């Protein structure tokens, strides 16, 4: 698989959630330092060369607490795939979005699919952020590992769309994902990449 920073992390997450091994080409590791550190903390086995990054989690995933930030921190575009990984980690994880408002609008879809996720307006899992004195929902507590189920969900944007695909990949039944065009807008030839990961997607 190949991709930029967002794509690289997304496909690393896809490989880990499927309990397989994934190799990502074409993204410099210095743009993924925080992501790689986070995945390793969760139990991923990472191998890095000048050409590619390989990840697997044969022993499963551990929970973590992560707050988003601007580069070189854990960038906000990674948090949606991470949220799905958290649903499959054994224990309680915390995600704290500190950069943009309304970045947790995809959570109801994951809840519908069986994810045990609660959202809060409080700052959790990190220092107080600029949303701390607002009513903006920007933190989530995720309890895993959850057995996800197939569902009919609508994907509001590219990041939410990819998280829905990841959740569907480990669900016990097929899912109907609406708004698939968002993924095509944000990822290069995503259906070919999904096929290489062993996912079966039929377009309606």
Predicted feature residues:
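Short, structured segments at the rim of ligand-binding sites
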Residues: 1-204
């Amino acid at each position: 698989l190949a991709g930029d920073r967002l794509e690289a992390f997304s496909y690393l997450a896809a490989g880990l959630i499927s309990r397989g091994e994934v190799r990502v080409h074409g993204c410099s590791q210095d743009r993924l330092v925080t992501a790689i550190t986070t995945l390793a903390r969760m139990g991923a086995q990472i191998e890095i060369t000048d050409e590619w990054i390989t990840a697997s989690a044969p022993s499963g995933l551990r929970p973590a607490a992560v707050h988003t930030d601007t580069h070189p921190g854990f960038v906000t575009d990674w948090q949606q795939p991470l949220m799905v990984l958290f649903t499959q980690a054994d224990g309680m994880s915390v995600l704290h979005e500190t950069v943009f408002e309304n970045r947790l609008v995809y959570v109801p879809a994951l809840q519908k699919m069986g994810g045990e996720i609660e959202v809060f307006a409080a700052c959790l899992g990190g220092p107080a952020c600029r949303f701390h004195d607002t009513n903006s929902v920007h933190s989530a507590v995720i309890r895993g590992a959850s057995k996800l189920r197939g569902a009919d969900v609508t994907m509001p944007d590219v990041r939410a769309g990819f998280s829905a695909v990841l959740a569907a990949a480990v669900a016990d039944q097929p899912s109907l994902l609406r708004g698939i065009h968002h993924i095509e807008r944000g990822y290069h030839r995503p259906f070919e990449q999904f096929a290489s990961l062993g996912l079966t997607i039929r377009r309606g």
